């Protein structure tokens, strides 16, 4: 078995491809089961699996079974998403072994994010791990890897300043609106969605002076809670056309699998604005739409409407590129922390080499203990239960004390890359089948 990663992110694939391979929350159980189950009678691709799917990345982490290749994973992605492999294979990256651990630790630390040091990825990594754990596709190796990666993210944020003042995708979207339109006071802002991205957008809009905020979401309770928290107006999802008609700025971030805003929606909104101005010869009204969702919420051809300016998450680079320079001074420290966590994982992995021999040694010791204990008890008559318990405890204590030094020695040797050598010596000394 081998640690394996196949993925794509904002550096290798545009949003048009990322959205095609994104896994929704409803997709995850089926996808993870297909990766780790053997319903067809053939061995599954992975013994363990976690899928990390966000607006900027889709990554499959796994412990492969013998015979699994990168092509098998490409074929899985193509079949699951019903897309020809040729349309996306050139955007994929593949890592094995140590490189997987290094990539995940850096990802959890925000070092591979579009917005350098952003904190949301930490929660997204945790959510991906917990979702796989609930489904039962996490074993000991991915459990340890993700726990160590989450520690890496936490340490980087606590031991460096990389996260201080770090933007989020939401903040970058608001900054884009501010740069394009200037003062946000008096602007009609429509937020579509009720999740974390929308909440962060609301926070940043208010911080930047926005004072006319409307929130629309399919789940009215979520929208109502956000609206109350930030002093916004809440509208039912069915009122989206009316909300668009009065909006100057639209920021959308739902989990819809297909667009919720099409060209005719925006065209009608622009026409309504034009009529309201009672100026048939004036330039068309402007509308700024920022689509932070993957898959996208807003159809791409909306951008063809005069007066409409449509941006996606990929367009945020112009806003956040300066953060790389601003935070490059602490990158070296962050990368050092990541490397320390990677080495901790690798050390743990090496200790796993010792487990088979240690298990056999413990089993052999138990066999001898049980044989000798039974022989002794047969020779001792009329023992009370308390006396038998004392002798039983004595035998266990002797075995544990005798096994502790070689066990500790082998684990330490394995942690330093000498596990196979010491395991072979131990197996020969104790006549173990190894």
UniProtKB/Swiss-Prot annotation:
Substrate binds at residues 54-57, 113, 118-120, 124. The active site is at 55 (nucleophile). The record marks 103 as: Important for activity. NADP(+) binds at residues 193-198. It is an enzyme of class 1 (oxidoreductase). Homodimer. Possesses an unusual extended V-shaped dimeric structure with each monomer consisting of three distinct domains arranged along a curved 'spinal' alpha-helix. The N-terminal catalytic domain specifically recognizes the glutamate moiety of the substrate. The second domain is the NADPH-binding domain, and the third C-terminal domain is responsible for dimerization. During catalysis, the active site Cys acts as a nucleophile attacking the alpha-carbonyl group of tRNA-bound glutamate with the formation of a thioester intermediate between enzyme and glutamate, and the concomitant release of tRNA(Glu). The thioester intermediate is finally reduced by direct hydride transfer from NADPH, to form the product GSA. Belongs to the glutamyl-tRNA reductase family. This is Glutamyl-tRNA reductase. The lineage of its organism: Bacteria, Bacillati, Chloroflexota, Chloroflexia, Chloroflexales. The gene is hemA.
């Amino acid at each position: 078995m081998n640690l394996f990663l196949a993925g794509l992110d904002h550096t290798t694939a545009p949003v048009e491809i990322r959205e095609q391979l994104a896994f929704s929350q409803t997709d995850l159980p089926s996808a993870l089961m297909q990766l780790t189950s053997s319903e067809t009678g053939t061995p599954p691709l992975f013994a363990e699996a976690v899928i990390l799917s966000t607006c900027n990345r889709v990554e499959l982490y796994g412990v492969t079974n013998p015979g699994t290749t990168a092509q098998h994973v490409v074929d899985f992605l193509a079949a699951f998403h019903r897309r020809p492999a040729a349309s996306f294979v050139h955007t994929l990256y593949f890592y094995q072994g140590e490189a997987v651990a290094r990539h995940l630790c850096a990802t959890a630390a925000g070092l591979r994010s579009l917005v350098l040091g952003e904190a949301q990825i930490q929660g997204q990594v945790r959510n991906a791990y917990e979702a796989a754990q609930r489904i039962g596709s996490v074993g000991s190796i991915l459990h340890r890897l993700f726990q160590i990666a989450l520690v890496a993210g936490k340490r980087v944020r606590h031991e460096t300043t990389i996260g201080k003042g770090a933007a989020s995708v939401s903040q970058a979207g608001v900054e884009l609106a501010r740069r394009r339109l200037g003062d946000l006071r008096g602007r009609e802002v429509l937020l579509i969605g009720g999740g974390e991205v929308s909440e962060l957008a609301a926070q940043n809009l208010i911080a930047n002076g926005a004072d006319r905020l409307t929130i629309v979401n399919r789940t009215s309770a979520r929208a109502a809670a956000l609206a109350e928290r930030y002093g916004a107006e809440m509208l039912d999802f069915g009122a989206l056309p009316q909300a668009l008609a009065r909006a100057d700025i639209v920021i959308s971030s739902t989990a819809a699998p297909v667009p919720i805003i099409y060209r005719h929606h925006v065209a009608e909104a622009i026409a309504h604005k034009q009529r309201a101005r009672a100026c048939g010869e004036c330039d068309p009204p402007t509308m700024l739409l920022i689509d932070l969702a993957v898959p996208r919420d807003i159809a791409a051809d909306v951008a063809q409407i005069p007066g409409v300016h449509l941006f996606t998450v990929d367009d945020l680079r112009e806003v956040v590129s300066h953060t790389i320079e601003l935070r490059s001074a602490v990158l070296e420290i962050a990368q050092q922390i990541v490397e320390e966590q990677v080495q901790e994982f690798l050390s743990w992995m090496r200790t796993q080499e010792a487990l088979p021999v240690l298990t056999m040694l413990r089993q052999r010791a138990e066999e001898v203990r049980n044989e000798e204990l039974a022989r002794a008890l047969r020779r001792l008559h009329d023992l009370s239960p308390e006396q038998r318990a004392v002798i039983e405890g004595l035998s266990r204590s002797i075995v544990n004390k005798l096994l502790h030094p070689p066990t500790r020695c082998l684990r330490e040797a394995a942690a330093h890359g000498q596990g196979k050598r010491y395991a072979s010596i131990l197996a020969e000394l104790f006549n173990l089948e190894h």
